[in-house]
Amino acid sequence: QCNLCVRACREVQSNDVIGMANRGHQTKIVFDFDAAMGNSTCVACGECVQACPTGALIEDSLLNEQGVRTEYEDRTVKTLCPFCGVGCQTNVHIKDDKILYVEGRDGPANNSRLCVKGRFGFDYAHHPDRLKVPLIRRDGTPKNPEVNISQNEIKTYFREATWEEALDRAALGLKNISDKDPGTSIAGFGSAKCSNEEAYLFQKLIRQGFVTNNVDHCTRLCHASSVAALMEGLSSGAVTAPFKAAEDADCIIVIGARPAENHPVAATYLKNAAKNGAELIVMDPRGQSQGIARYASH
């Protein structure tokens, strides 16, 4: 056995799930103490799959009913994982405009690592209810926010349109509102799902396009307390070091956070550091018995 899957689980993700059992010709790869994968402590990050050089471990989405790989990509797109703010870089392998599988790419935030969401959480992109073209409300259709429109009723209330028509319609409507009361009738509220570049363009649209400073972002509310604490303690409300810097730290303090659940790739660096001798202190008013607390000294 090459043991790459064991090393990926232990040394990269620090999950310590995959190991070797028995001796001699009976030696084999096991999960925990020879438990079935589904009953083990495996978090399905897929690091072992990416590390496997032979195809002994492979994504189920590539196999047919007989367990034979029949799907091969026709192109690969370099992008970022959309699930959280860690910024993991990915290679998305595509065939006929359908995602086949995702691999971690060597970037400063993840060093080719991914979590279960980043590697396997892409089925929403092909959900039959996903809107694929712009829709415009049909003339005369009543507007009622209390009415829940099912997928089968969408064409009753909306019609398909081109991007040009939809953008022109939206721009005209926003312009009419802005012209009625310039500077005060329009406000922009940004989303945490947007990248920094998208957030910059959004505020630029509000400030320059509609000539108003009525722009805000949801993270100002949820991170106001942490920013204030950072300003007082470090004289900076922004991040001062990447997660990977944990590898060089002697002591790491995690306060009120659950990185193993919410930012699993970031948590790998904390777990790596703890296994290499760093002091990991976890403070959480909700309490933690699993996750990052398993690796904490206090």
Model-derived features: positions:
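N-terminal export/assembly segments and adjacent metallocofactor-ligating motifs
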Residues: 1-298
